[in-house]
Amino acid sequence: MAKKSAVARENKRRRLVEANYKKRSELRNIAKSLTASEEEKENARVALNKMRRDTAHIRLHNRCLLTGRPRGYLRKFAISRICFREMASMGEIPGVIKASW
């Protein structure tokens, strides 16, 4: 099990990213725009720099929904490899069977 504080911090970051995604993407588009003036681009960059770091989606880290484990994450199932193996062997994941050939 991961520390509860680490999981809580990650959840907080996810909420911040969702809340600020639209504003951040608009500012990024202005900063990258070919038609915007240099002053507008500079203002957009300054506004982006003033925003909290945790509002950037790049700071998110995938964690297992069950244990909070940050490594060995399987995106398709949103759980770690260890939880996946346990659940698959117990038949708790529909459509997943042990391979045999």
UniProtKB/Swiss-Prot annotation:
Family: Belongs to the universal ribosomal protein uS14 family.
Species of the source: Chlamydia caviae (strain ATCC VR-813 / DSM 19441 / 03DC25 / GPIC) (Chlamydophila caviae)
Keywords: Ribonucleoprotein, Ribosomal protein, RNA-binding, rRNA-binding
Protein name: Small ribosomal subunit protein uS14
GO biological process terms, semicolon-separated: translation
Reported function: Binds 16S rRNA, required for the assembly of 30S particles and may also be responsible for determining the conformation of the 16S rRNA at the A site.
GO molecular function: rRNA binding; structural constituent of ribosome
GO cellular component, as recorded: cytoplasm; small ribosomal subunit
Complex and partners: Part of the 30S ribosomal subunit. Contacts proteins S3 and S10.
Pfam families: Ribosomal_S14
Residues spanning the signal sequence: none
UniProt keyword Ribosomal protein, yes or no: yes
NCBIfam families found in the cross-reference section: PRK08881.1 (NF006477)
